[in-house]
């Protein structure tokens, strides 16, 4: 997975574990990823709409964000 320009910034901590991330590409926030009910939920904006997707694996959500925000 080509995530060279991707940077994660934790912004939410639950029980000393980071459960919320802002996702940046080239210094611009492009998405968020949060853990809810044992699943990771990713959200990006596409024009005026918000696209959301979820998976049990963090890497799958990050990969989807990477593909959709190129």
Predicted feature residues:
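Negatively charged, low-complexity tracts enriched in Asp/Glu with abundant Ser/Thr
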Residues: 1-26, 52, 56
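Generic cytosolic/nucleocytoplasmic N-terminal low-complexity/intrinsically disordered segments
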Residues: 21, 25, 34, 48, ...
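A short, charged, amphipathic alpha-helix used as a generic interaction element across diverse proteins
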Residues: 44-46, 54-70
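Short aromatic-glycine-(Arg/Gly/Cys) micro-motifs in beta-strand/loop hairpins
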Residues: 32-49
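Alpha-helical context
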Residues: 9-11, 37, 41, 62
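Residues marking helix boundaries in flexible regions
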Residues: 7, 18, 42-45, 66
């Amino acid at each position: 997975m080509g995530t060279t320009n991707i940077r994660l910034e934790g912004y939410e901590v639950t029980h000393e574990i980071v459960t919320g991330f802002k996702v940046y590409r080239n210094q611009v926030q492009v998405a968020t990823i949060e853990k809810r009910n044992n699943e990771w939920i990713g959200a990006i904006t596409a024009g005026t709409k918000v696209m959301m997707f979820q998976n049990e694996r963090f890497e799958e959500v990050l990969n989807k964000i990477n593909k959709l925000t190129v």
